[in-house]
Amino acid sequence: MEPLRQSTDDLDRTGKQTQEGYAPFIIVVNSGWVDGERAMHLVERKNKTGFSVMDSDDINRFKPIEGITIPDGMAYMLADIDTGKQTLNVTPNEALPTILQQNRSPLTLEEGIALITHYPELLGKNNGFSLLASRCGDRRVTALWISGGRPKLGWCWAGNPHTWLGSASCGGRRGLPAGNSL
């Protein structure tokens, strides 16, 4: 992981570190290396473990949307992450063009799980977030929220707004420098 750590040196972290709903960077393990359902059971927030209403087969049907390039290798870094407070009560279908116009990228299912693994406090009661970069060909969008005090991976319809659900985004993804591997 050392090459990824070194690539954090040039990140602009001025002023954003204390911003609510923000993380400067996280490490994401590619989906070929970790099972999403199992990963949710490893998430812990306020001494309660995460869970998924989707089984592994359903989770594995969700793939990155067109235009989203996931770096090769076992792991990569996601930078400048925002949980989408400005998109609360905006449908995922309406939030996606807004995120893209801001030169940001929506998060994938795996990236969302990684985010709440590193920063479980970013997932709050009545303040979850959609993961717009993972779709499976139907109208569902995966999302993370608190249910019964526990982190939950589920889905919502792409055309429905929720007052408690925003759409997470990032400033970019960075893979390992050429010649490095994990």
Language-model features: locations:
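A binding-site-centric feature that preferentially detects glycan-recognition modules on secreted/surface proteins
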Residues: 1-105, 109-182
